[in-house]
Amino acid sequence: MDVKSIISQMTLEEKAALCSGKDFWHLDTPQRLGIESVMVSDGPCGIRKQSDAADHLGLNASVPATSYPTGSCMACSFDRELFRRSGEVLGHACQAEDLSVLLGPAINIKRSPLGGRNFEYLSEDPYLTGELAKNYINGVQSQNVGVSVKHFAANSQEYNRMSSDSVVDERTLREIYLSAFETAVKDSKPWTIMCSYNRINGTFAAENKRLLTDILRDEWGFDGYVMSDWGATTADRVKCLEAGMELEMPGKNAANDKQIVDAVNNGTLDIKVLDTAVERILNIVLKYTENKQPETKIDFEADHEEARKIADESMVLLKNDGILPLKRSQKLAFIGKFAETPRFQGGGSSHVNSYKVTSALEAAKGLDVTYAPGYDTNTTESDEALLKEAQEAAKNADVAVVFVGITDAMESEGMDRRTLSMPKNHEALVKAVSEVQKNTVVVVMCGGCITMPWIDAVRGVLYAYLGGEAVGTATLDLLFGDVNPSGKLAETFPRRLEDNPSYLYFFGDEQNKTEYREGVFVGYRYYDKKNMDVLFPFGYGLSYTTFEYSNLTLDKSKMKDTDTLTVSVNVRNTGKVKGKEVVQLYVGMPESHTIRPVKELRGFEKVELEPGEEKTVTFTLAKRAFAYYRTDISDWYVESGDYTIMAAKSSRDIACTATVNVTSTTQIKRVYTMNSTIEEIMESPVGREILGKMMAQNPLAQADADDIGMGEAMARMMAEMPLRALLSFGGDSVPAGAGEMLLKQLNA
């Protein structure tokens, strides 16, 4: 069907109606013109199609669906193909349920470990987030189902999320909070984007023309439609439309539709703006309806197995002093309510009515396993009787496996966490069991990171995150070594909450402003810059085998920023079992003239190796791998100089390094003023010549610095002195207008 022809036949009221939902999940299409209504649905880790009572917080029933591991779990796979595959099976399920757009992926950056929706988000690192997200998008959209990449932008907290103001400087916004969205838009062309609730530097996302039009469309080339998060549209519907927010959800808000109609009729809204919005929405509607696959069926058993495989690749082994893998001949104690009733998904809009859930206790049928609940999930207080029962079970076992984590009541959409500690009764259980059983392994089920005051008292820790409906089976796959753990942390685990760079400002001020004062130093970027000890670093994860890196090679030692650099490194499995290693590539500039992180992730690859096998892993680095965002030129800029290329097992375990010299091809014309320093002016040949003569007559420059005991300090003071100050010290020896003459020559 021809979209422009359809628009020409639509009434003004029909156009306005299309720009808001028909109900909670459907679009209000002009059905009299043969355009059927389409449905959108949550969520990133399993579809949440509601047929009856609808809501956006997971309160009412939805159709049965497969619950896959959450974003925080899946991201630890560091596996692009896994993300593409997971998107593909979700897109297939959407076709079967007649859903035109899946509301995900959620790719906000984990600014703080307190973030209430961190379980949905992928990482603290924008490069990792963008790479995984674009593959997920490709997978979903390969099934002719759209995605809605969310929440655009700088939406890293739940506290006052509908009104908070994220105050972020431009460089930080570009490098950290917009970067993953940019990758997703440019590389995968998502059908839709969902704008967030919050304000960004004073302007609500739904009204933010600079974000929704200037950056998203004009810079990045986005050609789909932008929908609001549910209830994110402001009182000024016309302003939102003019900013580039086409679809208001949910519907039906007759008053807002009337705003649009009235604005067109009284001439305050150009009909072309409305027609453009309608065209963008119809393009996506028809892309789905004209290529629907109504014969598609869901194979729930196959999808359940897929959920298990994803969890197998994603869970992270954090500690193992030889206790793992377990043996099926051992007498085991499974302790903790989560062994019987696992926590496998988050609360809120991503909550799925799971097809079936397999617990660890159920998966262990046929083995010699004693179970003790250990705690009551409806309270945080310990029960002495439950603790004693747990200790008895532990004492009579060869190995005690304790299942603990964070409860639904502490971690959900709509609220942020207030602590990194587990509930008191979970902490007490680990302590009680480890006191009577030296062979204690802890399995943690939660959406984000926690502190571990008991870490030295146990022999093993498996971090299951929220592992989806097959979490129990996958947990046993890893505990028994049927699958070799290969997950790596996609976020840093700090030792204390207070160590996090956003700690002082996370919940905002009395004006509801949340200042991102840490700038680009989010996650490992901060901990590395501070050289701060952490509990577990970004990119960390153990295996049942070992890997050795060697022969890091660059295809050139010098390059321009317009060139590409090919990097290769050899990886050998030096252990006795097959395993997968995530090779991480970081780039840093030790002698940078600007404030930059020590290193930043710029590549990763997951490689499988048999015992004794060696493979060469190759990466290609282009301009952005070396660049930072310069606000004075409003563009990405590569500073000339030496860069260190690091092949690593984690952000703190660097295996090999090499150096490449990069020359910038961007010429930046410096504008000199009376406030320019002597050091800055001396960088110019003209400045060196003229200032040399002026300083020869300056009493400060003539002084013998060593005689007055200042030495290097005197030289530093002179270097940092502004031109206006130097001229004032010159007295009569400096001719009138000398400064203006110098500036004219410098700026010529």
Residue ranges and their predicted role:
Residues 1-628, 642-646, 651:
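Glycoside hydrolase catalytic-domain context in secreted enzymes
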Residues 663-683:
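Low-complexity, Pro/Ser/Thr- and charge-rich linker/hinge segments at domain boundaries
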Residues 745-747:
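Globin-like tetrapyrrole-binding proteins
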Residues 623-667:
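Terminal connector regions
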Residues 676-740:
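Conserved, compact domain cores that house catalytic/ligand-binding motifs in diverse enzymes
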